[in-house]
Amino acid sequence: MKTMKRVKTVATRLSDFGKWYTDICLKAELIAYSEAKGFIIYLPYGYALWENIQKHLNCTLQKTGHQNVYFPLVFPEKLFHKEKEHIQGFSPEAAMITTTGKKNLSEKLVIRPTSEILFSQYYSKTITSYRDLPKLYNQWCNVVRWEKTTKPFLRGKEFLWQEGHTVHATEQEAMQQTLSILDIYQKLGKDLLALPFVCGKKTETEKFAGALITYSIEALMHDGQALQAGTSHYLGIIFAKSFQIQFQDCDNQKKYAHQTSWGVSTRLIGALIMVHSDDEGLVLPPYVAPMQIVIIPLQTQDESVKQVSENLFSILQKNYRVHLDLQDKTAGWKFSQYELKGVPLRIEIGKRGLENDEVTIFQRYNFAKQNIKIKDFPSQIPQLFETMHNNMYQKALQHLEQNRKQATTYEEFKTYLKQGGYVAMSISGTDAELQIKQETGATARVILETNLITANCPVTNKKALQTVLFARAY
């Protein structure tokens, strides 16, 4: 048997959380760095995670009547200036194409940072009657935003996402769409990713550039920092006025259409890593894992062990994403490798176990090992996966709830903030929010639909108007 180098370990979360995170991204072979700074290569294992998210969300959106489309990567710069608030929000990050070969372009082309402009321009040409509504379009694509500081999956100059763009006849219909998408995202987190989210409305300073209202899903990472994992925006008739998206209603009146836009991105993969993983490497929930089960024969040269392994693989691959590892490497090396890659379930097959018609199963998320009869094993997998997924969700939910506090004074707020997690406080408005951000680095995550904690704002001593959840965030 070949002598193999031991699988490289990752940094610990307590010693260096940032290095621990990038170690997992690189050593679990999710990504590689490219030659262009701020751009990553999605390796097969990492891209498969995104594909599984796509499949799940596509299935849901098809049931709700949404259709997938693809719009161009670029649009003329002149369109960028049609909606002032939108351009103010995105122009600092917008990348432009100015030359082709040695020639300057007669008109600069903007590489999409988001696609509200492209969709609005199209809708203005194609929507004329109430019979054309609603339009429920979704796009899977890449976008480019020239970020100064980058981190794999969380913040990059290019990232992958889905962006929905819908058009409706009334405000009520558009708002219903905005909130229903928020529910879909929350369900995606719970059912596929085992991620609990805090959901709510964004403050005026944190809302999307060009939106009337923004809602977001927020996840809490293991280090106590928040991560905005997705957003859903009610755009009102702002873009409709800028791009003249009008329709003839059933009463023969010309009206502006109401729009929404919404999206989740590969940030969800970053959230998966930071919430579930441990000091041994990646930990993945079973339903999203690219490789759900790995079968490891302990004696690869033994014919009976090999035969049972191949038979079991043949049975399991009909319903699961399963891999049979027949490489000429030590079992210990393989164990470490698949633990690093976060494979939810490992099956160890050896001569001693076969004497009792048993295999050993290992669950990655809690390191539990048990022997089980070969004939009983396939029928028990659904329950194993369900328990595994639910336990991972509950663990993440417990972490979120234990790190969610409320403050009645500014000093108490600062103390809680240093401990990490979410801190709720009733504030007077934007003035208090900006002061908090400047003095503590915490940002408003969502507005809570709860009673005021205090009558006056602890920061400004003015009358408190709303209770806001704050955190330091990625």
Swiss-Prot record:
<keyword id="KW-0067">ATP-binding</keyword>
<comment type="similarity">
    <text>Belongs to the class-II aminoacyl-tRNA synthetase family. ProS type 3 subfamily.</text>
</comment>
<keyword id="KW-0030">Aminoacyl-tRNA synthetase</keyword>
<keyword id="KW-0963">Cytoplasm</keyword>
<comment type="function">
    <text>Catalyzes the attachment of proline to tRNA(Pro) in a two-step reaction: proline is first activated by ATP to form Pro-AMP and then transferred to the acceptor end of tRNA(Pro).</text>
</comment>
<dbReference type="GO" id="GO:0006433">
    <property type="term" value="P:prolyl-tRNA aminoacylation"/>
</dbReference>
<keyword id="KW-0547">Nucleotide-binding</keyword>
<dbReference type="InterPro" id="IPR017449">
    <property type="entry name" value="Pro-tRNA_synth_II"/>
</dbReference>
<dbReference type="InterPro" id="IPR004499">
    <property type="entry name" value="Pro-tRNA-ligase_IIa_arc-type"/>
</dbReference>
<dbReference type="InterPro" id="IPR045864">
    <property type="entry name" value="aa-tRNA-synth_II/BPL/LPL"/>
</dbReference>
<dbReference type="InterPro" id="IPR006195">
    <property type="entry name" value="aa-tRNA-synth_II"/>
</dbReference>
<dbReference type="Pfam" id="PF03129">
    <property type="entry name" value="HGTP_anticodon"/>
</dbReference>
<dbReference type="InterPro" id="IPR036621">
    <property type="entry name" value="Anticodon-bd_dom_sf"/>
</dbReference>
<dbReference type="GO" id="GO:0005524">
    <property type="term" value="F:ATP binding"/>
</dbReference>
<dbReference type="InterPro" id="IPR002314">
    <property type="entry name" value="aa-tRNA-synt_IIb"/>
</dbReference>
<dbReference type="InterPro" id="IPR033721">
    <property type="entry name" value="ProRS_core_arch_euk"/>
</dbReference>
<dbReference type="GO" id="GO:0004827">
    <property type="term" value="F:proline-tRNA ligase activity"/>
</dbReference>
<protein>
    <recommendedName>
        <fullName>Proline--tRNA ligase</fullName>
        <ecNumber>6.1.1.15</ecNumber>
    </recommendedName>
</protein>
<dbReference type="GO" id="GO:0017101">
    <property type="term" value="C:aminoacyl-tRNA synthetase multienzyme complex"/>
</dbReference>
<keyword id="KW-0436">Ligase</keyword>
<keyword id="KW-0648">Protein biosynthesis</keyword>
<dbReference type="InterPro" id="IPR004154">
    <property type="entry name" value="Anticodon-bd"/>
</dbReference>
<dbReference type="Pfam" id="PF00587">
    <property type="entry name" value="tRNA-synt_2b"/>
</dbReference>
<dbReference type="InterPro" id="IPR002316">
    <property type="entry name" value="Pro-tRNA-ligase_IIa"/>
</dbReference>
<dbReference type="GO" id="GO:0005737">
    <property type="term" value="C:cytoplasm"/>
</dbReference>
<dbReference type="InterPro" id="IPR016061">
    <property type="entry name" value="Pro-tRNA_ligase_II_C"/>
</dbReference>
<comment type="subunit">
    <text>Homodimer.</text>
</comment>
<dbReference type="Pfam" id="PF09180">
    <property type="entry name" value="ProRS-C_1"/>
</dbReference>
